[in-house]
Amino acid sequence: MDNRPIASKLLQMYDRQFALINATVLTYNIVGHQKDSDYLLYLVDELSESKFPHELPNTYEFAQIQVGKLAEIMSKVRKSMKVSKNLAHMEVLDSGASGAVNFVLGVSGKDVGIAYKERTDKGIYAVSVRGSPSCKTHLGKLVSTVSSELGGSGGGHDKACGAVVPKDKIKKFVREMNSRLGSR
């Protein structure tokens, strides 16, 4: 952050902790309201008037609520995550898979973390996959191949990707990912 032209000027003007706290509060408010376009437009309007996140009503309180939710997810990951030879995985029941997958990756110590959530209305699992910096496999390509072979679809970046997999194929998806990661 420090080596970017705008950021380096701002960090000369403001205390680093001040900037980091405001950035964190803003991030939690954006993520927590990601489906509330009215609130997001309100944020844009306020920020475009050069207001800081700490100056906006209830932003700290909302960020605290979001942190509490993340702590609950982390606790559930610690209790429910399964570790295989080449990856860790977990079915998510009450939050989004993309919110849990980073905890699965980080808590497990594995190079690959997978979180998946059933979409009962569609008969599929929504899958999020993350790789550590030391993961040598392009996960987006691997996920695309494996999910397609199982009647789903997916892909993405080398360290962050996702898929949709038919409900009855999720266990096979995880097994195939574990197997193919081991053969690379």
Can you describe what each PLM-predicted range is?
Residues 1-95, 103-110, 116-119, 176:
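A structured phosphate/pyrophosphate-recognition subdomain
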Residues 6, 86-184:
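Glycine-rich, acidic loop segments that terminate in or are immediately followed by a histidine
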